Amino acid sequence: MYPVSFAAFQKLIVNLSEIASELKTANGDNRTLVEWSRWYYKEFYRNPSIRARFPVKVAPCPRRTRDNLLKVPEPGGISQNDVANVAAAGPSQVEQPEVLVEGSQLTTLAETAKSHDAVEGVAVECKPSGSESPDVIVNVERCGAFIFPVSFDVFLQCINKMLLFKKIVRSIEHCLVLLSDDERRLLTLQRFYNRFYMYPEKRSPTNIFNATTEIPLEKLLESGKPLDKKAVKTVAELTAMKSLTKNSIVSFEVFKKNMANLSDIVEQMRQLDANYASKDVQECALDYYLAFYITPRIRYKYAYKLKPCTSTFKACMLSILGKDIAEKLRKSLPQLANPSPGLDSRRPNTSYITESKGSLGSQNTSGSSQIQTSPSMEVAHEPSEGLSQLATLSPENCAAGAISTTEGLSSSHNTLETFENQANLRNDANKLSRCMPALASPERHLHSSKAPEKSSEVLSPQVKPHQSKEVAEEQSDRAPQLEIPPSGFEVPMSKTPESPASKTRASDETPAKPEEITDSTDVYETSFVTDVEVDLKKHGRFIFPVSLETFRQYINYDEIIRAILVNNHIKDEHQLSKLISDPSHPQCKKFFRQFYNKFYARNDVRQRFKYKFNCPNPKMLAKLKQKAKPLDEKALFTMNRTDNAKAVNESKSQVPFTPKTTTENCPPNPISLEMFKRHVSNLDDIVNEMQKCDEYKEKSKEEVIQDYYEGFYSGPDMREKFECRFKPCPSKKIRQLLSFPPKNKELPPKNPNCQVACTTENLSDESCLQSSRNVVRETQNITEEKPIAEHESIPSTRTPSSNDDKPGEECPPYPVSLELFKSHVSNLDDIANNMQKCVEYRGKSKDEVIRDYYKGFYSGPEMREKFACRFKPCTGHILQQLLSYPGKNVNDCLQETDCLATCTTRTPLKESCLQSKSEMSLPVRRNALEILMKRKRTKVAKEAISSKPMTTQNTSQFQPEPFPEDALVVPEDVTTNQGTQPLELQHELEVTEPIKDYIQLNAERLYELSSKLKIGWNYTAHNFLDKLFKGINCPVTQAFLEEQYKRYSVSTGHIVANTIAAEENEPQLSSNSVDIESVCTAQTTATDTQATEMHTIPKALDQSSEPTKESSSVNLNNNLESPAKIKMIHAESSNNSRNSTNRPNTEIEAGSTKILEDGARVTTEGNSENENSSVEKKENQFLLERAKEIFFAEGSKDHNLKYLICTSEGLMRTIWRILYQLDLQEFSYYTSIHDGEDLYKSEDNLHLCFRHVVDHGNWPVNLCVLLPRLKHLLHSKGVQLDRLNLSKISPKIFSPWELGTYSDFDQIVAQEYIHRTGEEIEDVVKLCQEREKLYACCWAHNQWLPRAPQIANETLNAELGEVEPVIERILLKKICGVKDGDENKPTEIVSIPSSPSTVCSRISTQPAEDKLSQQPSQLNSLNFVDVTGVELASQVPQMVVDPLVSNQIEETSQVPETQYDAPASLQMASVKQEPISFLNNQRAFCDSEKCQWEHINPEEQTIDLDSTESDGPSLSCFAIQNQNSEDQIHFILEDSVHAENHDYVKKTEVPKSTDPAQLGTNVNTLSVRSMPACQVSVIPKKRQAASPRLNSKRMKLMNDKVPQLRHEFQPLPMGVKVVQSKALILPDSQNIRTSQTAKTKPTESPPHHQVNITPSQEFAVGNTLLECSELQGLLDSNDVNDGKVNKEDHPVSGSACTSKRLAASSPQSSVIYRDLELFSFYKSLTLEQIIKYRIEGPLPGATYQKALVKINDKLCNVRGPLISSLFPYLSSTLRSDLELVLHDLGEFFYKRSWPAHTDATVDFRKRVLFVFMNLSPRFAPFSIKFDNESREWGTCIEANVGDKSLDQRDTTFNAEELIKPNILNSIEQLKCKLVT
């Protein structure tokens, strides 16, 4: 029955007990291990796929026994009787197979498998128990017949219908419909029944069956099985679509939406292919979708068209599957297993053809090319998904999980029989194919070695059980390590490889017989796992020759891992030995995994490490040394990227990487590596930049230096890509450093456009005169190409692969190969995309289009003209080959001139082009060639002007590209051969010279002037000042610039007279002047625009040098070639950052070594070093003095830090405060002065700058904070920011150059320019100009226009975890001096909430200037008031003067008569100077204009306010009316005459009056005077003493001698009027209009009747002193936001009335609905909390609360009595309890979106408060006063029923002003008609 018995199976399988334990653990039942062992024994032969899930270990045994143990029985090996016997054996043996017993139509499942070839194999049950319910066959419409475990009726009996309906219904209405409609309900249940068993993987984890059912749950959870071909197709399609989704293939729905012509393709399929004629549209579309990814050949037959989409999504749409997955799916799908013959009409061209293909094929043996493997002969056995999930499923889901994967088995009986018939026909090549499976059969199934379940390899069966012993032995001798078991399955190895000790013991115990040696070798080789699939994510998917464990086992692991660890900076020997001895260490595993991936995916790693394999078998060694095989395009690109860089070097010699030394074949470099490293100053920066590239990312520093050294002397490419700077050295040494080896020496100097991009530091002109001919700065970034020397050995004939598709066509050899052509064309991708848009190339792939272009390029000039190409920088020899034609097209070379205009290189290699043209010896007349050269010269000059690519990232490095004239000189070999051609040819090539335009004339004149000697000439432009003043219309600025230019010219020896005189007279060509305007037409735009933008640029104007004996000339714009030297200093903007100004001065000092633009300079020779150094020192000194002058210039209030702090809010205010409290070290580190960095080098100057900024509070124009260090500064001060948000930061602290470098500010500039002018910015210089202009606007308005830039460099947002803020040393610094009280008197500090828009300022008590001697970071005492030092009679707030506007304000609290220098219009009169006391035994009624006084009876006199037994009736005698009139503002200002003249007017004293009647009269006669025409918006501040200069009236209060109330409190003022602070910020027009309206139109409104209430009754309400309304009014007068007004009972006079427009200036709103978003409460503030939450105002230790509410869908921060305002419905007891809980917590923070009440870890008190605030009603009437129109901050006020709303609007209007006259006439006519 089975190959071996169960007893033999137990002996041979070593880990059988472990497998049985694992099965028992996974199922969790009560069966024994013996039963599970027997079950596994049966399944081992019945279902071979279980071997992959549970790998076995075979004990040492003879080979024949091992083969017999592992073989797979034949399909007919187990008879039906055996099946019946097994079924009768009971559960202890093996499970009973599924038997269909329902009716006569049902047969056993095994018979069904024979009759229906679609069913492959027998399903496996996980639990060996019999089934109690028979299986049924169900025909599902359009899906085929399936075998379900239970019938539909049984399923309905076992299902919980209500639970099911909750899962599947869409709504309650849908559920009711199902319950009421029986037919619909049954139909829905039937569909669910079908889906439940057809698609078991889509089941919900919820158990929908009843708890008690007759059918076991395992039976109910079984999955259905397909019965016919249609069902198999349905399951296969579902599996295929799942597999496509797993492999990142788009779904079918997405495919249909994005395939534009899918309907056309389906129609073509139905018309052209008979297989799809009978199918409907949906089926054809699904077949095309599956074939599109599984059989990609269909893409070539039916041309597809995608809808517009992104490149990433397009790549996803066009991706393909791996060969193994596609082959598996192709076999499982019937419609794709045998595709239509039409698909074979066009075979796709493979994309794996590379130049390294030959080397790969050379590693194979000679017999490997004869292997013919048919894909249909291979059977890929996939491990069962159900078994892989066996251990993770629950017991009730175990059976369903195992059975649901039956369709995954793909081994059919017919395939096995085919292998049996052809087994004896295998030859030696078949054995070799088994030895080298990766090369012979690449399409076989492969498994990844990453997952433990798939670590073992499953191979295709190549050897049958009855194969001869000789063949097996021969196979074992050839490649025992890759031997494939004859049963078709390799013995899977264990998860960990065998240790060497165990293998040694096994080899020692084995006898020396050949058979036994072979057997032991088999056991030894079981751990050699080959051909594993590895996914490297973005680098692609590969097939590696061996697994990671096998690789680690054979390679010299200890040496490799030591080298890797040392390279990663692990130097400690103890740590190294510890890591090396532990391969399982995560760090070692990570590094070795990376080495393993790079070893096979990249070739350069093998050259950098000395590896060796401990493998005696040569075939195993060859397998270990193989390369990886790419499986997708990313992998192919990864391998080609490394192969292309090393292709030529590998062809010369295959040697490991060693530092190259001087050999006979390679000429020695001019200097050694050590000397090179000593002379290069920026070598570390170059190494860092190179290591950012993929090519050098994994190399060490020394290796990168070696590569740069070799590339530096191999060609100009490395010098251009990575610019180097040499240290100061003699000119001889410079020439030696810049020279090339003898082999390459003649190339770079003769090619002026391939010269070296290097600079030197501090080189003199004399030492650099010779090197200047070889050194030119290139501004254009050129990508790295192959060294020039690599291309010299490339043959000019094409490779055999260039026309492989047309072997029969005779085609002449092309000049270069296709691969070389592709590597030198820079825009090949763009050409291919443009060609694919044409009709003739539309259906072709990219490779085919490139091949067609390659052929057309060398077939004639048509292709070159139609699609212009650009070549990368290369030598003239290579360029000649690229532009030449094949032999038969030599006559077409006459078109070469046209090709020169289109096939341009990225760096203009004009000399190379001309040299290649001249070598063809074309007969051209001299005049024609000269005309051609002149035209070419003019064209190149135009291109230099107009076609410059603008870079926004490195604008500071922009430099106009030089145009060397000698590149277009007529070659001598062409001119000397003229006249030797036939006369006919000369006549044909004769070219007539056209009329020269002005550009050509200028270019020719420029060339003529450049070739002449000019001694002692000074070039001065006649319109120089016009260009200097371009864009500046201010005469003052123009005069300033002209004066600066004159001063600079005089200091440097220039003669200014010629320049100024040239403005009026036209220049004449003479020995002293040249027409620069006409000559410089062909000049680059950079020079003109730089001269234009020299507003204050004395540095940009170089001086002329004295002529010498040798021929010399001057450089007019010597310093204009680099924008780093452009110093555009505006009067209102800052300038370059330290990054741009911190460059080495090598560009200035070695300025004469640069080859500049023609027409902008004339070369100078013989200038002395001393003269240049003195000039440079003068320039630097002038710039330094200029920067110092700007820095210490007198600035306006916008440049004052105190003003900026007062007018800023939020984060910006915090930053200004931080900058205001910097210390000296922080100031020098975080800030920078434009053009004044040298000021920081001197200690004296640094202290001066520090005192000017920090001590005196100035912020100069040219001072900025370094943007890269801003986050570090904030972090060190305790301000935690995840990202820098520039919208919350003022533009004043940044530099425009840093904004252009680190943000998208340049993009905003470009967009704003386009929006304003409709044109794009042409060059970088224009961009710099516009950047300065826009930044100046942002500076002037102190805000970003039109939008705030975003940080583009993410390095600025990097985390700063190591920098911890030092809170202990942070002290908040005072802005203004606060009046000090008596030192002996205790000071009470009251916290006053502040808003961002208003700041309470105090006038300094010092006579001249502020005394700012506090420590940095000291707390801002601006918002805190000393209550004990406040005069009680001075509580009426005066009009506050901004301390930043007037610095001469003086005050004193000791002498009332002290004058101060504030304008008279800003002063207010104070009231009663003596203390106010309460009346005694008197009460007054102010119901009219006069006060009526009444005596209090003796029995009513004694009132004990401290008594708790006082009640309302006992206090009714003290009732006074609480008036509720509108807020009145009484400004007593001086006349406008005094306000304008600022005269000192002495105040006349008003005699005191104790008459109460006179007091009432005086109060009612107060009037508001007209406000001045120019009203200054000021900020209210604390009450000051009355000024003696004020000529105003005083309020007369009560007599001091009246009877007093007897109580224990301090006497309180009862008649003081507190001015509302909000009215002080009214606009001028509104204030004036209000005053006028109050004078002309008095309002006589009757007083509002209120219930009389006495002061004692008000005191009794709160029972606390602080809740007293009168005292609270006095306290609130100091607050800038919460000012209250005492109410009066008498009617106000007309002069004191306020217009309704006053409400608009002080926005107030009555709110009845709000959403509480945030609420915070702090019982006692700490310094850390103030800094962390940016709390403004309160001192440490004060109580603080704030809320964020949403009113009318807008968020507002509110302050004030929050608890009583937000929760007015609370009783006094509940409110006190709430306050008690908050004080008990100490700190509480509520957020509505945070469900803290559900978190059990949160404090219970906080959870209760969260629930309370969540459930609090949102309807809560209260009033809120907003700080300004933005309504971001406000103060809440409890809303009273009697209060009159302040935001009433006047609804009256004039209809005639709003309605048109014709409409009014129509209304009147209609009214007349209606009346009549």
From Swiss-Prot:
GO terms for molecular function: DNA binding. Pfam families: Tea_C, Tea_helical, Tea_mid. Keywords: Chromosome, DNA-binding, Nucleus, Telomere. InterPro entries: Tea_C, Tea_mid. Residues 1110-1122, 1133-1145 have a biased composition (Low complexity). Residues 333-385, 441-519, 779-810, 1098-1178, 1629-1650, 1679-1699 are annotated as: Disordered. Residues 348-376, 1629-1640 have a biased composition (Polar residues). Disulfide bonds: none annotated. GO terms for cellular component: chromosome, telomeric region; nucleus. Residues 442-456, 467-477, 505-516, 783-793, 1681-1691 have a biased composition (Basic and acidic residues). Its main location: nucleus. It comes from the Eukaryota. It is found in: Nucleus; Chromosome; Chromosome, Telomere. Part of the MTV complex that associates with the HipHop-HOAP complex to form the terminin telomere-capping complex involved in telomere maintenance and prevention of telomere fusion. As part of the MTV complex binds single stranded DNA in a sequence-independent manner, protecting it from degradation. May mediate recruitment of the MTV complex at telomeres through interaction with components of the HipHop-HOAP complex. Component of the MTV complex, composed of moi/modigliani, tea and ver/verrocchio. Interacts (via C-terminus) with moi/modigliani and ver/verrocchio; the interactions are direct and require fully intact moi/modigliani and ver/verrocchio. The MTV complex is recruited to telomeres by the HipHop-HOAP complex, consisting of HipHop, cav/HOAP and Su(var)205/HP1 to form the terminin telomere-capping complex. This is Protein telomere ends associated. It comes from Drosophila melanogaster (Fruit fly). The lineage of its organism: Eukaryota, Metazoa, Ecdysozoa, Arthropoda, Hexapoda.
